Amino acid sequence: MKEAPVIKLRELLNLLPHRYPFLLVDKVLSYDLEKRSIVAQKNVTINEPFFVGHFPEVPIMPGVLILESLAQAAGVLLGLVLENDRNKRLALFLGIQKAKFRQAVRPGDILTLSAEFSLISSKGGKASARACVGSQVAAEGELSFALVDKQSLD
């Protein structure tokens, strides 16, 4: 059964500053603001620009981009939490702890990206995140973010 997205691409573009070729979330399947959790999806295709060099004979999605996909999914939830401040503030990915890569991600895979925040404050947040292909965990870790005023980045 195919899951209908609750947030499609057009709305994602309002929630994330990323654009092609660096937009690594295709849709949001579900989110819960009370539980501070989100489930999103990235469809991995052979047309991804990183497959040109990583690796042409055996294409594998770079682990760092799997982590970036997780950070973007979590960033969508922060964008929803910020709501009215979204145009003034930006969530910046600060770091990752306890990152583990458990399975290669290849063209044709569908990455399910889930994140749950243990902390969201006016300064930032922390979330546990996991990327899966089917029922297999591909990568996981603990993400941290800073919330900054966009004007401070000028």
Swiss-Prot record:
Which GO molecular-function terms appear in the entry?
(3R)-hydroxyacyl-[acyl-carrier-protein] dehydratase activity
Set out the biological process GO terms recorded for this chain's protein.
fatty acid biosynthetic process; lipid A biosynthetic process
Subcellular localization: Cytoplasm
E.C. number: 4.2.1.59
Tell me the active site.
H54
Q: Which reaction does it catalyse?
A: a (3R)-hydroxyacyl-[ACP] = a (2E)-enoyl-[ACP] + H2O
Tell me a GO cellular component: cytoplasm
List the InterPro entries.
FabA_FabZ (IPR013114), FabZ (IPR010084), HotDog_dom_sf (IPR029069)
**What highest taxon heads this organism's lineage?**
Bacteria
Record-linked SUPFAM superfamilies: Thioesterase/thiol ester dehydrase-isomerase (SSF54637)
Enumerate the UniProt keywords alphabetically: Cytoplasm, Lipid A biosynthesis, Lipid biosynthesis, Lipid metabolism, Lyase
Q: Which PANTHER family match?
A: 3-HYDROXYACYL-[ACYL-CARRIER-PROTEIN] DEHYDRATASE
Which family is it part of?
Answer: Belongs to the thioester dehydratase family. FabZ subfamily.
Biological function: Involved in unsaturated fatty acids biosynthesis. Catalyzes the dehydration of short chain beta-hydroxyacyl-ACPs and long chain saturated and unsaturated beta-hydroxyacyl-ACPs.
User: What is the name listed in the Swiss-Prot or TrEMBL entry for this protein?
Assistant: 3-hydroxyacyl-[acyl-carrier-protein] dehydratase FabZ
Question: Where does this protein come from, organism-wise?
Answer: Chlamydia caviae (strain ATCC VR-813 / DSM 19441 / 03DC25 / GPIC) (Chlamydophila caviae)
Tell me the lineage of the source organism: Bacteria, Pseudomonadati, Chlamydiota, Chlamydiia, Chlamydiales
Please state the gene responsible for encoding this protein.
fabZ
